[in-house]
């Protein structure tokens, strides 16, 4: 009912920051996201004809490679409801609580960024995360079509104009 009202009001797309497909990771990060509710929302938005730009974050301190595979499974199970994907690698904010509890360093000498490189508690380093995203997740037969239709320089401001591409490619 709510999603149909959104569509009727002119909503063409919603960006949903689901972050992870593993409930334990979401709970450890205090995200307040329930995967059963996220699943129901994806289905309801699809039925209403509203495109979904799903945001998933990999390499957070509580995530393991096995957890990332569960996120892949979540995306695959919901692939018909996800129009576009934003797959990101976690950046550790320099002054965060996590930064104080992890072994950190600058990304490179002279780095003035707001983020720090860190030693992942489970050994799930950025290179491993990047390889997982590029070589496994993006190449999965259910995920690859979503990646292909997601514009390269995509921003949520422009996404509604590309919603019609949902079933192409």
Enumerate the language-model features and the residues they cover.
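A structural motif corresponding to the C-terminal lobe/cap of the Radical SAM core domain
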Residues: 2-169
